[in-house]
UniProtKB/Swiss-Prot annotation:
Bidirectionally degrades single-stranded DNA into large acid-insoluble oligonucleotides, which are then degraded further into small acid-soluble oligonucleotides. It catalyses: Exonucleolytic cleavage in either 5'- to 3'- or 3'- to 5'-direction to yield nucleoside 5'-phosphates. The lineage of its organism: Bacteria, Pseudomonadati, Pseudomonadota, Gammaproteobacteria, Enterobacterales. GO terms for biological process: DNA catabolic process. Keywords: Cytoplasm, Exonuclease, Hydrolase, Nuclease. The keyword Nuclease applies. This is Exodeoxyribonuclease 7 small subunit. Its EC number is 3.1.11.6. The gene is xseB. It comes from Escherichia coli (strain SE11). NCBIfam families: PRK00977.1-1 (NF002137), PRK00977.1-4 (NF002140), xseB (TIGR01280). It is found in: Cytoplasm. Belongs to the XseB family. GO terms for molecular function: exodeoxyribonuclease VII activity. Heterooligomer composed of large and small subunits. Pfam families: Exonuc_VII_S (PF02609).
Length: 80
């Protein structure tokens, strides 16, 4: 497991680590101090993931803005 403040190499690795933390926390088997440490790491990973998603969204918007004919529309899963 990466050190406490170390950022995972990729969004996917961060998400995987976050899912593992959630599983451990949901098990209810962790001592309080360890659970708090895991929770803290999970919050950190969630924030890093959110930052990476925002950066990706900005890159897409920049790429689309270079094309004058392309229009940005908000993503909704119902639009297919």
């Amino acid at each position: 497991m990466p050190k406490k403040n170390e950022a995972p190499a990729s969004f996917e690795k961060a998400l995987s680590e976050l899912e593992q933390i959630v599983t451990r926390l949901e098990s209810g088997d962790l001592p309080l101090e360890e659970a708090l440490n895991e929770f803290e790491r999970g919050v950190q990973l969630a924030r890093q993931g959110q930052d990476k998603l925002q950066q990706a969204e900005q890159r897409v918007q920049i790429l689309l803005s270079d094309n004058e004919d392309a229009s940005l529309t908000p993503f909704t899963p119902d639009n297919e």
